[in-house]
Amino acid sequence: MIDVIVAGGGPTGLMLASELRLHGVHVLVLEKEASPTTYVRALGLHVRSIEVMDQRGLLERFLAHGRRYPVGGFFAGIDKPSPDRLDTAHPYVLGIPQTTTDRLLAERATELGTEIRRGCELVGLDQDDHGVTAELADGTRLRSRYLVGCDGGRSTVRKLLGIGFPGQPSRVETLLGEMRVTAPPETVAAVVAEVRRTHKRFGLGPLGDGVYRVVVPAEGVAEDRSVAPTIEEFRQQLRLFAGTDFGVHSPRWLSRFGDATRLAERYRSGRVLLAGDAAHIHPPTGGQGLNLGLQDAFNLGWKLAAEVNGWAPEGLLDSYHTERHPVAADVLDLTRAQFELLSPEPGPQSVRRLVSDLMDFEDVNRYLTEKITAIQIRYDVGEGHDLLGRRMRDVELERGRLYELTHGGRGLLLDQTGRLSVGGWADRVDHAVDVSEELDVPAVLLRPDGHVAWAGDDQQDLLAHLPRWFGAAVG
């Protein structure tokens, strides 16, 4: 029997598959599209996602294909400098097309032994106390112990489970695509600058060789958003907002998106779970979607692996919903607020100017930047040291870097005292004796996702906390 079927071969599904494979879980990824998409949905990784790649030893691959940008200016496109001394070793945004991100994650998943089947569409599922039966469009039936729906905003898995998806429908829509432009670059730049003085959802960004990424408000909301717009729709809307269509032609791909925000009522139903856009949708303001999905996978992977491998403590798998559902709710509010600030209406523009003024205060700028980059997230792991529940930033050690010790996806005790022991949890938790000038606590216990589960120097206190996240001791 397959351990876990992942429905959906996008970044969330591929990241989840890799996390599961690090723990020896037999994973099958089912992707309904026969070949990788050329549609560039997202354009970059925020700080926390960059840290995630570094924690798994993947960052150099991504840096080789991306470009670093300042983190400032991502909240509603308000142009402000990056805050000073952001609490990370990676204070930048990595510009990288999602098509490249997908390819790198697929390569990683395959290297780890993941089977990826393309052209396989899940159309039905049934579960019992022992597993899940998945039915494919060609009539094939597959049996697995668990199944995770990473199949996007129109998730078949979510619909088959009957999980509610409440929220706000789209009120406005935006056209997005890549196409050739015949107008001179200087003309494009001048017209775009003028239009964007009042219409923030308008832009033409050069990609090279005469190709531009074009974004322009649509006329109304389409009855069926799964139907791609036409090049003529782009021309019409460009003329409406800019007085010219810039001579657009030869589209690579065309799409549309709205400002809908929806959040699944629950992330788990028995042996089936949801992650990524299958669990939450929102407008793309602030570049949150792909990053939110990657971090869902990073949170879920080790917990589901623990369940499959038989050492998960009670409630560990349910903590995926407990921890990630509020994060998504916060992101929905964040993206909705930013989208409102893009409106050309006088009211939202007045608020935008006020927010811009407030961001001149360092604390306000830092607060919003930390929310955009997701480094402010703190899970409820109990009371105690201020580090508890927070993700641990990378720090320099005497013998290397902290994140170099987390590539295997296990728990980690970083012990600056040399007096502690992980005892009967050594098969699940690595023990590193090393010191860092950047760390002012004797020792920290990190979960496989890099969040701090314990901090201190008392051996008995450590042993009392290990079972909550790593199950019963062995031996």
Task: Please state what every model-predicted region is.
Residues 1-3, 7, 23, 77-79, ...:
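Helical substrate-recognition/capping region of FAD-dependent monooxygenase/halogenase enzymes
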Residues 1-352, 356-359:
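Core Rossmann-like FAD-binding/catalytic domain of the broad FAD-dependent monooxygenase superfamily
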